[in-house]
Amino acid sequence: MRAVEERHPVLLEWFGRRQRDLPWRRTRDPWAVLVSELMLQQTQVARVLPKYEAFLEQWPTPAACAATPLGDVVTAWAGLGYNRRAVNLHRGAQQVVAEHGGALPDDLALLLAIPGIGPYTARAVLAF
């Protein structure tokens, strides 16, 4: 534990010099965090940046995403690859609306029951 405590200031200093200003670091909205986590799976940050904010402008909530045709979500996903993630995001949004009143749950087990959300993604959503 001592080694971690000693490295903490060094890591913070390094991050302060090297950090990138990424839009998903400026939000505490669980939906926005989920969208970013799914977009970033096996996809370069440079590909995600132009899509992320446009996606959230069009679908700022799970309810907005759930109400749109799946084809529109997949079309907006174009260029990110692995369209199954877009399908799962849409299905997950529909489930969130149907089972949780449109708000992402703040419970690990409930998040894991949503399509496309695994342990890492669920914990990332809960961290914010």
Annotated model-derived regions:
Residues M1-I114, Y120, A124, F128:
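N-terminal polyanion-binding entry modules of DNA glycosylases/AP lyases
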